[in-house]
């Protein structure tokens, strides 16, 4: 079976009112862009060969204390392979807390890529190091949700 080029999409679903990561969509876009420019690929069976997007669905709640990554799901009639990621809630107020969030996201994505056997041009560690460098170029307020 040949390698299939895939892309990453990140979305968020929050289960509790007022409980969410207070970061701008710009953080998720940066992560998606950096991952997607690295020619992600995986081997898919003939039945799954139409899929070309890994959809990471991020959630948090006051009850989540550890990083948890769900089993990849293959919705019918969809291009997506959905992966649910539960991350511990972090109050993102400064660079340190933003980098902690990014490290947690890196751990979850690395686990998912390993499980799906996704290949990349660069290591996930190198990709996330470049993400952190980009994040630190801007003041923290650039990356936070505007009130």
What are these regions (language model features)?
Residues 1-145:
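Sequence/structural signature of beta-propeller modules
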């Amino acid at each position: 079976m040949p390698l299939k080029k895939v892309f990453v999409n990140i979305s968020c679903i929050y289960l509790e009112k007022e409980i969410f990561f207070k970061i701008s969509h710009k953080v998720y876009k940066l992560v998606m862009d950096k991952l997607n420019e690295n020619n992600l690929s995986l081997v898919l069976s003939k039945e799954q060969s139409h899929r070309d997007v890994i959809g990471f669905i991020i959630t948090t709640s006051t009850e989540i204390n550890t990083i948890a990554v769900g089993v990849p799901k293959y919705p019918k009639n969809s291009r997506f392979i959905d992966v649910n990621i539960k991350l511990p809630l972090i109050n993102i107020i400064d660079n340190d807390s933003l980098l902690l969030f990014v490290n947690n996201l890196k751990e979850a994505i690395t686990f998912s890529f390993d499980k799906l056997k996704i290949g990349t041009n660069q290591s996930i560690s190198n990709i996330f190091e470049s993400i952190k460098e980009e994040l630190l170029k801007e003041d923290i307020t650039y990356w936070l949700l505007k009130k």
